[in-house]
């Protein structure tokens, strides 16, 4: 492996607590972290250092599990084990909690904005996925409650350019949803993982979806539209999703997160074996049966489980990670020549 993942900086982001998740703002200038200390922290670069610009600690009563920025970068959503989601409005360096979304019966596990910024999705241990509509007055209204999963829903993510939503669950499946006649419907169920699906990531085109699981594999699913040249069967006008690649044998424990770089198409994983791994699609790889190579591996990236990896949306190769050890780390991925 000629490629390298170089540590740039390591910060104790959430002392005496797990650091659960990270999210870059769309400009790539700020990073939000959240943790078991009930806080959200905003990090910004000053020179070669990353410093804490703001601590948001008034919004939640329990662990903050996930954070997500709006596409405009002016709002931050935080999902908490207290069963609420807070919406924070950015005013220069300060953030104000302007709305608290309530309705889930149990812990909210994930939150994600649609690319338009007009829709927000949340999911929970109560097995449901909620879709919220945002109007011009920044009022949030639940427009659909989806009960397609049979267990705890771990993660939600939107397609990068369409209003297509994906969710991952403790029931070992991935589900996809779209709007149909003023309501949201489940339009596909992706089966194949043998245990909990922890996280999801679309590739830059939105034609492929990566899923990672407690079964220690990453699966790559490809979308096939009706009438596709490959002859993959579709139901009526619905697209079909097929697993075209399984990355197995690389991880020794649960894979908690997968991130697909929107600039380079590089995959990164966060694992319960304390490691970070980076995969590149092989040059000339068949799109219908793609192959990926492990190009970087940091065995002790953190001293405990790695919970999240996040590629910077503007700076190639800049990767952030966080862990049960409460730390946040910044890495520079340097691919070898020829990739």
From Swiss-Prot:
A GO CC term assigned to this protein in UniProt: MMXD complex
Name of the protein in its database record: Probable cytosolic iron-sulfur protein assembly protein CIAO1
InterPro entries: CIAO1/Cia1 (IPR028608), WD40/YVTN_repeat-like_dom_sf (IPR015943), WD40_repeat_CS (IPR019775), WD40_repeat_dom_sf (IPR036322), WD40_rpt (IPR001680)
Keyword line: Chromosome partition, Cytoplasm, Repeat, WD repeat
Record-level GO BP terms: chromosome segregation; iron-sulfur cluster assembly; protein maturation
Gene3D superfamilies registered for this protein in UniProt: YVTN repeat-like/Quinoprotein amine dehydrogenase
Disulfide bonds: none
Summary of subunit composition and partner proteins: Component of the CIA complex. Interacts with CIAO2A and forms a complex with CIAO2B and MMS19; the interactions with CIAO2A and CIAO2B are mutually exclusive. Interacts with CHD1L, ERCC2, IREB2 and POLD1. Component of the MMXD complex, which includes CIAO1, ERCC2, CIAO2B, MMS19 and SLC25A5. Interacts with WT1. Interacts with CIAO3. Interacts (via LYR motif) with HSC20.
Domain of life from the UniProt record: Eukaryota
Segments carrying motif LYR motif: 176-178
Subcellular location: Cytoplasm
Family stated for the protein in its record: Belongs to the WD repeat CIA1 family.
Protein's UniProt keywords contain Repeat: yes
């Amino acid at each position: 492996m000629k490629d390298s993942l170089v540590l740039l900086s390591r910060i104790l982001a959430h002392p005496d607590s797990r650091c659960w998740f990270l999210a870059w703002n769309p400009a790539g200038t700020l990073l939000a972290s959240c943790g078991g200390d009930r806080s959200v922290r905003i990090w910004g670069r000053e020179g070669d250092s990353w410093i804490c610009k703001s601590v948001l600690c008034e919004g939640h009563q329990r662990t903050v599990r996930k954070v997500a920025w709006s596409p405009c970068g002016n709002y931050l959503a935080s999902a908490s084990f207290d069963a609420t989601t807070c919406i924070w409005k950015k005013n220069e360096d300060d953030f104000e909690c302007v709305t608290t979304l309530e309705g889930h019966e149990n812990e909210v596990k994930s939150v994600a904005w649609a690319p338009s910024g007009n829709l927000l999705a949340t999911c929970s241990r109560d097995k449901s996925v909620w879709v919220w509509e945002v109007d011009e007055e920044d009022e949030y209204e639940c427009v659909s409650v989806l009960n397609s999963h049979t267990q705890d829903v771990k993660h939600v993510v939107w397609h990068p350019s369409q209003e297509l939503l994906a969710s991952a669950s403790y029931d070992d499946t991935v589900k996809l949803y779209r709007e149909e006649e003023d309501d949201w419907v489940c339009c596909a169920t992706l089966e194949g993982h043998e245990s909990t699906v922890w996280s999801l990531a679309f590739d830059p085109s939105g034609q492929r979806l990566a899923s990672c699981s407690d079964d220690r594999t990453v699966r790559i699913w490809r979308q096939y539209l009706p009438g596709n040249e490959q002859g993959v069967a579709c139901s009526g006008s619905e697209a079909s999703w097929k697993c075209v690649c399984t990355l197995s044998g690389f991880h020794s424990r649960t894979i908690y997160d997968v991130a697909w770089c929107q600039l380079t198409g590089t995959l990164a994983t966060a694992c319960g074996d304390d490691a970070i791994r980076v995969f590149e699609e092989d040059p000339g790889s068949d799109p219908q049966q793609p192959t990926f190579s492990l190009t970087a591996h940091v065995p002790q990236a953190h001293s405990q489980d790695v919970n999240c990896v996040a590629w910077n949306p503007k700076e190639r190769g800049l990767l952030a990670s966080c862990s049960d050890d409460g730390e946040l780390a910044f890495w520079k991925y340097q691919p070898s020549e020829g990739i």
